[in-house]
Amino acid sequence: WIVVTGTNIDYPILQGSTNNTYLRTDYKGNHANGGSIFFDYRMAEKYSLNLNAVIYGHNMTNGTMFRAIRTWYESATRNSTAETMRIEVYTADSLYIYTPFSAYRSDGSDFATTGFASYDSFVSFLDTISSRSVLGRNLTYDSDSKICTLVTCTNNSGNVKERYVLHGLLTQVYNFD
């Protein structure tokens, strides 16, 4: 489950065998233009093993799914709102809390990298995504850090590959046992 405080993002997260599985399918298995919020299919089944937990959702014009990311990104209060925003991911056994540290628009896909050859390559990845950010935040990260990446389309008809990308740095984990 995902909740982003200060927004209406409050949805179950699914994971399919491909990234197309839940693109136009709801959590009940029915066709839905809005699809579902879903993890990248390449992520490890055990959530805690992922260095970069990539989560996709549509930018629906009716305000649902990840539309709130676009609304937040385009707002004049983006930086001040990010100060109190939290990304919460609930699994069966834990709550993972992330603090936003990077946000940008991208027409690439390297932000969705889920496998890293080494911890040094992961830190290099963190440096890259941090340098792209429009946020004025300088959170400290290192090779032991973990992040989540929220991704939604911009609905830019001139560039259909362009995405809004929001990265959160894992700051707390609460175990339910």
Residue ranges and their predicted role:
Residues W1-D177:
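Solvent-exposed, non-transmembrane regions of membrane-associated and secreted proteins
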